[in-house]
């Protein structure tokens, strides 16, 4: 009866061919879906149900390619526009439950865990991503078991914090969030530290490590970041803090901090570049007693899961990043979700830094950015422009004229006194890098007229470069390190 009822409901509904040409889908999505239907579907299944299984599988993997960890059936049903009607979320759940070898249903104990997809309420996962979420959640529960209930530092702890960092010498811990973050780290094995650029995350991180080494001189510390570039910046930022912020640190602790070498998470976890399997795991955990990860918002769901699996049982973990930053290129918004989770269930393990110490003098720009982050409607760009001009005259509005976007870019470079043809005279790689570092064009989006892809092409026109020929002096980005 259930199958007959579902078939009647879905007979006039959407078919795979109606979705194949949509830009959110790739041919690989439909190849994956066809494989699921071929290997996991019952031979006696109604054709309409098989088509819905195919659509669900293709859409689930399409979501992963677009950096989501799963397909939210409820949202998708409300947002997907098509000539034929979509089943509602309840109908999707009913149909998918008819294919237990393809879809594991979490609320059904009889459902085989080996299925390639997993249904959790209205969320349809590729099973390995659901397993990643479960591993991260299990480790977070371990951290929550010994979470502090109060975060008031002792007088001795406050004295140590003030003594070790000159910025905190006369600071009030009730008002200074950086001091609060340091104090929280002393009483908990987990700290998530989030804040925008210039809010002092590196200062907090360095002070925490200095205090730990002062108390435990032989503590093993591992520093990591998602990319080699981020790891390099981490090293430079720590060196800068050691030169300008830390005071009263014993020579041995200073040497230990100077010797710390941040590495990529892939290298830390000994991930095989061919298989993606981590050499460090639950059976062979890391040897570090304190693990510090920077730029966490760039870390994917799978990489976060591998990190959590490799942590020793009693290790301390400090996660640093900006939860409002763009998400990982791969699936998941893990750091943001962890911050949201801790804010609800364990606020003593979360600290949010809001004061911008780097750009604090530029009040107009800081207020504008804060309005965007806070979601207080769309800020008025004209007010921002007027404020910036009154402050230092740096804002220029360049309307597009007959010369188009390329002409506007050329005028911008000329107004900023950037010698357009200087790249042709670069006699060495060092000079070429220096020219590239003279200016940067930032885009809010990747695609579209004002996106990264198009503006890079326009810049090639401005500079007289033929991108397909890769001329000397043309900047390139390495997308994969296969060494």
Please identify what each model-predicted range represents.
Residues 85-156:
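Interdomain "pre-motor" coupling segment immediately N-terminal to P-loop NTPase/helicase cores
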Residues 1-87:
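Intrinsically disordered, low-complexity N-terminal extensions of AAA+/P-loop NTPases
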Residues 52, 132, 177-178, 189, ...:
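N-terminal positioning helix adjacent to the helix-turn-helix/winged-helix DNA-binding module
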Residues 324, 328-475, 480-483:
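Conserved helicase motor core of P-loop NTPases
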Residues 157-190:
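Conserved pre-motif I regulatory segment
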Residues 22, 26, 66, 126-130, ...:
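Conserved phosphate/pyrophosphate-binding and hydrolysis machinery centered on Walker-type P-loop NTPases
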Residues 150-153, 170-173, 180, 278-283, ...:
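Short helix/loop segment immediately N-terminal to the Walker
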Residues 179-182, 186-389:
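ASCE P-loop NTPase helicase motor core
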